[in-house]
C-alpha cells in the first residue's frame, strides 16, 4: 500500500470534486460565494453541488446546542458500519429531511439485510459448499429460466446504476432489493 497523499498531491488527487455535498442551510454560500472564490483563485469548479436534507430526531433537527441527536458510535457498535450506511441511504430519500429511529433501524436491519440479502448470500454460499466443494462450477448451457433470471438481473443493475447516477440511492437500493 502506498502512503496517503498529503498537501498538493492530495489536493491534485481529490479536486475538483465530481459532487460537492452540502447541507441545505448553507447551499447559498456553496452555490454562489464558494464558486466565485474558486474562480478568483483560478481553480476548477465542482461538477455538481448537491444539498442534502437534515437528519431529524424526534421531529427536530439535530442540534449540539439543544443536545438533540444520535450518537453514531452507538448505532455502529450495535449494527455495524455497513448497516449504518445502508440505513441512511435506504430509509431517507437523499436530499430530503429524514428521521432516524432505533425501531426503524432494527426493523430494516432484520427484514432487508438479515432476512433478504443476508439469507440469499448464506444460502448460496452453503449450496456451493455442499454441492461443489466450495468452488463455483463452470456454467453449463443456459436454460430459459436462467436467461430470464439474467434479464431480470440486467434490468436491476441498469435501474440501480441509473438511480445512483442521479444520487437517488433509495431507488438504487430498491432496484437491487427488488431483484433479491
Enumerate the language-model features and the residues they cover:
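Glycine- and acidic
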Residues: 12-22, 99-107, 161
